[in-house]
């Protein structure tokens, strides 16, 4: 992994709030400029906005597109490491560059960047340390009926496992305070979205959700290309995350069937 500083803007204020918006990327050359152009340049309560790209071993021109656009930082993997590892590498990079708030969004432009202000407002007000953007799943045209049901079911399972009320657990459109980001520790290789909610819920990190909008689909989802593969991997992720905080309960539950 290589961390590349493209441009570091200096703020002359003694105290200021820095927001870094990060985007995990894998072969996103066709959509990256669209997603980057949509990002805010200024936000109320924020003195400095910077942009970080995680190039997860892309085989296209993603890296060149990020450089030409002028992002501040690039975390560059020579080989594909997967979404979870890319997310954590981005978080580490944002923390190293002094981010007070970190927003994670997707390079396929599925999330409406105009709603980033909604994500950071609860953090700025001191009401939460993690804010998850809740998509209008039932109104999202490019979601199939099966995908909508699985999204709702998966979110319900995560709510039970995490003891939280987050309505859209798979959403990757999120904001983290510096304090929350420093406590994140993703151990699975598949996705960070479910595990981080379970972790935050069990560690009692203040977390909330806000409604956000979505854009039209620019490319098919790479995580959801196999329905049952998605379900299997998601359930394994949730169980592993839950076992980290409730090992005795999980062990007891798994031992009941053989005993009976």
Annotated model-derived regions:
Residues 55-63, 109:
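A conserved acidic beta->alpha catalytic loop
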Residues 20-24, 36, 53:
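Short hydrophobic beta-strand elements that form part
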Residues 47-57:
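Short beta-strand/loop segment that forms part of the nucleotide-sugar
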Residues 73, 77-96, 101-103, 113-190, ...:
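Acceptor/aglycone-binding surface of glycosyltransferases and processive sugar-polymer synthases
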Residues 2-17, 187-260:
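Hydrophobic helical membrane-anchoring modules
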Residues 30-34, 60-64, 81, 85, ...:
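Residue-level preference for short helical/loop micro-motifs built around acidic side chains
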Residues 28-42:
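Short, well-formed alpha-helical segments that are part of the catalytic scaffolds
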